[in-house]
UniProtKB/Swiss-Prot annotation:
One of the Pfam families matching this protein, by short name: Ribosomal_S18
Molecular function per GO: small ribosomal subunit rRNA binding; structural constituent of ribosome
Source domain of life: Eukaryota
Stored SUPFAM superfamilies: Ribosomal protein S18
Provenance organism: Chlamydomonas reinhardtii (Chlamydomonas smithii)
Protein name as it appears in the record: Small ribosomal subunit protein bS18c
Chief subcellular location: plastid
The protein's assembly and partners: Part of the 30S ribosomal subunit.
Gene responsible for this protein: rps18
Cellular localization per UniProt: Plastid, Chloroplast
Length: 137
C-alpha cells in the first residue's frame, strides 16, 4: 500500500503571507517575565484606586537578632502623632475626626488614628477647631 499513489486530486492550498501566522516561541523566563509585568500593572492600578491605609506600629520593643532587609511599603505609612500631614487626611473641615465609613479604616485603625489625632492636638501639632472655608468669604 505504501508504494501506491492515490488518484485523488490534492486540494489546492493558497499561500498566505508568513508574517500573519508566524508564532513566537518564548522561553519560560520570557513567559514568566510577561506574567510578572501584567501582574505588576494590575497591582499598580489597584494602588491608584485604593486610599492609603496606615500601619499601626508594634506596641512592644522586639529584640532583633538578625538584620532583615527592609520591605518596601508602597501603599502604607506608620501612624504617628508627628505625621500631621497624614493625620490631617482624617480630620474634616470643622476639625472633627472623620467617621469610619468615610476613612474606610478598620475599627482598630480608626481607634488608633483617633488616639494619635488627640495626642497631636494636645502637643499643638493639630488644631482642635478649624473654621470652615465659608467663614472667610
Amino acid at each position: 500500500m505504501r508504494g501506491l499513489k492515490s488518484n485523488k486530486p490534492k486540494p489546492r492550498i493558497q499561500k498566505v503571507s508568513v508574517r500573519k501566522f508566524r508564532r513566537k516561541v518564548l522561553s519560560l523566563s520570557q513567559i514568566l517575565s510577561r506574567l510578572r509585568q501584567k501582574r505588576n500593572q494590575k497591582i499598580e492600578q489597584q494602588k491608584r484606586n485604593k486610599p492609603i491605609k496606615p500601619l499601626i506600629p508594634p506596641k512592644t520593643l522586639v529584640i532583633v537578632l538578625k538584620e532583615k532587609p527592609e520591605k518596601t511599603l508602597y501603599n502604607r505609612r506608620y501612624i504617628d502623632y508627628k505625621h500631621s500631614g497624614l493625620l490631617q487626611r482624617y480630620i474634616g473641615l470643622g476639625g472633627k475626626i472623620l467617621p469610619r465609613r468615610q476613612t474606610r479604616l478598620t475599627a482598630k485603625q480608626q481607634r488608633f488614628v483617633a488616639k494619635t489625632i488627640k495626642t497631636a492636638r494636645v502637643m499643638g501639632l493639630l488644631p482642635f477647631v478649624s473654621k470652615e472655608r465659608s467663614f472667610f468669604k
